[in-house]
Amino acid sequence: MPNQGEDCYFFFYSTCTKGDSCPFRHCEAAIGNETVCTLWQEGRCFRQVCRFRHMEIDKKRSEIPCYWENQPTGCQKLNCAFHHNRGRYVDGLFLPPSKTVLPTVPESPEEEVKASQLSVQQNKLSVQSNPSPQLRSVMKVESSENVPSPTHPPVVINAADDDEDDDDQFSEEGDETKTPTLQPTPEVHNGLRVTSVRKPAVNIKQGECLNFGIKTLEEIKSKKMKEKSKKQGEGSSGVSSLLLHPEPVPGPEKENVRTVVRTVTLSTKQGEEPLVRLSLTERLGKRKFSAGGDSDPPLKRSLAQRLGKKVEAPETNIDKTPKKAQVSKSLKERLGMSADPDNEDATDKVNKVGEIHVKTLEEILLERASQKRGELQTKLKTEGPSKTDDSTSGARSSSTIRIKTFSEVLAEKKHRQQEAERQKSKKDTTCIKLKIDSEIKKTVVLPPIVASRGQSEEPAGKTKSMQEVHIKTLEEIKLEKALRVQQSSESSTSSPSQHEATPGARRLLRITKRTGMKEEKNLQEGNEVDSQSSIRTEAKEASGETTGVDITKIQVKRCETMREKHMQKQQEREKSVLTPLRGDVASCNTQVAEKPVLTAVPGITRHLTKRLPTKSSQKVEVETSGIGDSLLNVKCAAQTLEKRGKAKPKVNVKPSVVKVVSSPKLAPKRKAVEMHAAVIAAVKPLSSSSVLQEPPAKKAAVAVVPLVSEDKSVTVPEAENPRDSLVLPPTQSSSDSSPPEVSGPSSSQMSMKTRRLSSASTGKPPLSVEDDFEKLIWEISGGKLEAEIDLDPGKDEDDLLLELSEMIDS
């Protein structure tokens, strides 16, 4: 109809995006209708809504099955014109299956078979990159011969065996040169060579014609695996009796019959039978068996030879139509239709004594591997005995080259690193040795021979231990600690005896503590604190080594601990040497301190009131006067101090940097601050104020200030407590006035005083109560706090906090 035209193709079959502007007809009633409107064909359809299609049918879509119906999602089209066998749901609507019946065009079975055969052959050819010679011969014969299909069900021929390539080469030569001699059947000589020479037919009884099984993919794979394992292990002994009993598989798969026939070459020449039999027996290297009677066909005899078994066959069915018998026999024989053709493969392969020896893939791989091995043995004679010949599997034999494992490589790397670190540590220890010897020469003047000998013996022992990287046990560490404590106590016995001779001398010694802190600290802390720190570092070493921490770290730590020990021992020796000069040093230090002398006295008095609460304040005055008297020997002490300053740049004598500690101790102190933030928490405000009061000093010194000031904040209240109980007017006034008056040096000196208090308490045998309390504190801190916090056991936390807040306010 001219005004409406024909139906819009896109609207009819999918969706038209033009909408109203589309010149073609959009009629929803006609969608999916496969009946052409006859009036429209005549050009006189005037209906507004015509249910029939105004479009010629180029295909009969209702007779074509819908492609999408067989897809996982199914057909989702409401107006799908194609044929649907099943009902479907589209947008919640149920659409019934198509009413039209698909016309089944009766195809001739030959055509069906041809179609299926073509698809199978295409699969084979696609799997094999180049068609095997058998298939080539098949293609030649196919055009010339027309063979009737046999009566038995189809057989799946697995032409794409991966390991058949070398056999194909063999068969190629054979097919071209002596085609008749290679065929095992007497009646049919040219045919049915589909996969390889090794796959002959096995079915024996003609009565079992209908019992050919179609193998599934799993069966084929499992047989391949069996075949490989038998080749490696059993050889010919694995031939099972299943060869003679094929499994009957029911199934009307008739379309594959032509597959067999097409991929087979048949020849009906009869003249070559004896030749074939002779060549077959020669090839297999077996005697002929007289199997059954003379009426047995020659096929059976060749089978008996091949399998080495007596075969009894029925005497019927021999006189069937010759062609069919030939076809079935040749099929059975050539295509290997038994249940286990691979077993026969194995025997065949083992017993092959052919004129042309075809190497299998395994043999080739073995040869290559042996060649490689020969080359490698010249290079790697050391590894020769460890290599083993994997003659069973070709894949394994090629990997006989010794490859280092990851762990071996790691071990080698570690070994190299260890050696490098040992060399470094040797250098380090020799450097340390030289430095220490030179320092001893500078500083130790009185007994140089003894000291230098002791020092030089120690580093030598240390270098040995470092070279051997010996992991110490806990018992060894304890023994070493005990020895060290003994040595240090012996070295320091002379000086404490001098100190304890008179109380005045002892007081003077305590005054030196403010600036010449190094001597006394090392003297009194040497026994406990130093041994603790060294034990701690050694324990760390031991744990690090045992837990498998990298050896470089251990050696670095060991170097540090060695340096610490050397410095400690040297300081102890200096200390023992310089004990006669203590008084001079004290006077020198007080003179250097200049202004802070006033504040030093209250600190000392506080300490004395704590330690000796029953003593009167007269002794304090004696002490201060003693300071004035000892100003004569300042020059000598100053010279010795200067010498020490040259030898050790880290030690600074000025009061502004009184906090200087020997460098190895800085790290443990920082650790103590970090690990015991909870202990220090209550003290934080005072510590910050003291840091603000500090003059700008060296960074190393500043790092230690918080801990020092915290010690002060805890120890000052207990020093004030006896001051309140014992009325000492001069001390009180001076100490009260000291915080506002003194700026930087005073605070630092007070901090050094508190440090001295704690160390002195460790050096001297304390009171029993104090001892218990210090033990408790030591347990709480886990042995990490080096300067133990002295607290008065009579006070509880609230009193201490109150006094702290009062101090902060003042």
Curated annotation (Swiss-Prot):
One of the GO biological process terms: poly(A)+ mRNA export from nucleus
Zinc-finger ranges (C3H1-type): 2-29, 31-57, 60-86
Annotated coiled-coil segments of the chain: 362-423
Protein name per the record: Zinc finger CCCH domain-containing protein 11A
Locations listed in the record: Nucleus; Nucleus speckle
Keyword check for Phosphoprotein: yes
Basic and acidic residues composition-biased segments: 309-322, 367-390, 417-432
Skewed-composition ranges (Polar residues): 391-402, 749-762
Chain ranges passing through the membrane: none
Function as written in the Swiss-Prot or TrEMBL entry: Through its association with TREX complex components, may participate in the export and post-transcriptional coordination of selected mRNA transcripts, including those required to maintain the metabolic processes in embryonic cells. Binds RNA.
Residue(s) carrying Phosphothreonine: 321
One Pfam family here: zf-CCCH_3
Modified residues (Phosphoserine): 108, 132, 149, 171, 290, 370
Region called Disordered, residue ranges: 139-194, 223-258, 285-351, 367-432, 482-549, 715-768
InterPro entries: Znf-CCCH_3, Znf_CCCH
One GO location term (cellular component): nuclear speck
Induction profile: By heat shock treatment.
One MF term in the entry's GO annotations: RNA binding
Ranges annotated as biased composition (Low complexity): 486-498, 729-748
Keywords: Coiled coil, Isopeptide bond, Metal-binding, mRNA transport, Nucleus, Phosphoprotein, Repeat, Transport, Ubl conjugation, Zinc, Zinc-finger
Subunit-structure text: Interacts with TREX complex components THOC2, DDX39 and POLDIP3; the interactions are ATP-dependent. Interacts with PABPN1; this interaction retains ZC3H11A in nuclear speckles. Interacts with KPNA3.
